[in-house]
UniProtKB/Swiss-Prot annotation:
Gene: MC4R
Record's protein name: Melanocortin receptor 4
GO cellular component terms, semicolon-separated: cytoplasm; plasma membrane
Pfam families, per the entry: 7tm_1
Chain ranges on the Extracellular side, renumbered to this chain: 1-43, 107-123, 187-191, 272-280
Main location: membrane
Cystines in this chain: 40-279, 271-277
Statement: the UniProt record of this protein carries the keyword Transmembrane helix: yes
Length: 332
């Protein structure tokens, strides 16, 4: 997925980046000189150290999320199980991008005999990235469905969303996404595969949007119905809406961070020879950075929106070698 490979090197997701190669001579020359009308130059270079650093940060943050959910029994609920699945997907996307940078660096510095082996490894990493992307989308959709049930089927929720069903759902998501991700990379040279991936992305977003339109339009009506019941129904419903708002933020960040990459794919198949499309595609590495930033931002959203998760984060950090930071923060 990372495009720091030499010109003319086409492997799996790398072949989806035509901004620096595979273009007609006149367009290539325009890029080489700098496309003055659009302010474009050759493929934007991002230091490999940036990819590796972001990968490490994402790894640490998302491991913290996974450990926190596993450690705190108060977080053993369907929503947090799906968040855990999303954290795994985010971690794999970001770490795989960082690892791929190392692989491509080795590819550029090794002999021709070793390149075929390195390309195979690169294809495996790309399969992980593609599978994790699909798992991220499916996990977000699962959280949306879970929030929908908590609001519209509050009284039957615990009978509908059992731990067993959640486990089966998560397992099915990862099995299907793994198979799909591998197939996408195997047939990545086909435009039909790219169209299919784009279609999956926008279809999932449309499904989530439709759930949210219905959810927020009807939320007040259901809050009024729950309010007449004995107990703390209103409080419970308010917590459910808070979870829905959290997911709205997650989806918004996901769209902002992933949309440029999918727009790149749309340009790749629709106008690969247009100078303006080439201009947009010349920033491919920047779009990869945005994708990795999504994996870093998500854990921060969890922490800001969940007091229980924030509390567990602090407990874990205080028990780690960084525990001295807790003493320092308590003094101020």
């Amino acid at each position: 997925m990372n495009s720091t490979q030499p010109l003319g090197m086409h492997t799996s997701l790398h072949s989806w980046n035509r901004s620096a190669h595979g273009m007609p001579t006149n367009v290539s020359e325009s890029l080489a000189k700098g496309y003055s009308d659009g302010g474009c130059y050759e493929q934007l270079f991002v230091s490999p150290e940036v990819f590796v650093t972001l990968g490490v940060i994402s790894l640490l943050e998302n491991i913290l999320v996974i450990v926190a959910i596993a450690k705190n029994k108060n977080l053993h609920s369907p929503m947090y199980f799906f968040i855990c699945s999303l954290a795994v997907a985010d971690m794999l996307v970001s770490v795989s991008n960082g690892s791929e940078t190392i692989v491509i660096t080795l590819l550029n510095s090794t002999d021709t005999d070793a390149q075929s082996f390195t390309v195979d490894i690169d294809n495996v990493i790309d399969s992980v990235i593609c599978s994790s992307l699909l798992a991220s989308i499916c996990s977000l959709l699962s959280i949306a469905v879970d929030r929908y049930f908590t609001i519209f089927y509050a009284l039957q929720y615990h009978n509908i969303m059992t731990v067993k069903r959640v486990a089966i759902t998560i397992s099915a998501i990862w099995a299907a996404c793994t198979v799909s991700g591998v197939l996408f990379i195997i047939y990545s040279d086909s435009s039909a595969v790219i169209i299919c991936l784009i279609t999956v992305f926008f279809t999932m977003l449309a499904l989530m949007a439709s759930l949210y339109v219905h959810m927020f339009l009807m939320a007040r009506l259901h809050i009024k119905r729950i309010a007449v019941l004995p107990g703390s129904g209103t409080i419970r419903q308010g917590a459910n809406m808070k979870g829905a708002i959290t997911l709205t933020i997650l989806i918004g960040v996901f769209v902002v961070c992933w949309a440029p990459f999918f727009l790149h794919l749309i340009f790749y198949i629709s106008c690969p020879q247009n100078p303006y499309c080439v201009c947009f595609m010349s920033h491919f590495n920047l779009y990869l950075i945005l994708i990795m930033c999504n994996s870093i931002i998500d854990p921060l959203i969890y922490a800001l929106r969940s007091q229980e998760l924030r509390k567990t984060f602090k407990e874990i950090i205080c028990c780690s070698p960084l525990g001295g930071l807790c003493d320092l923060s308590s003094r101020y």
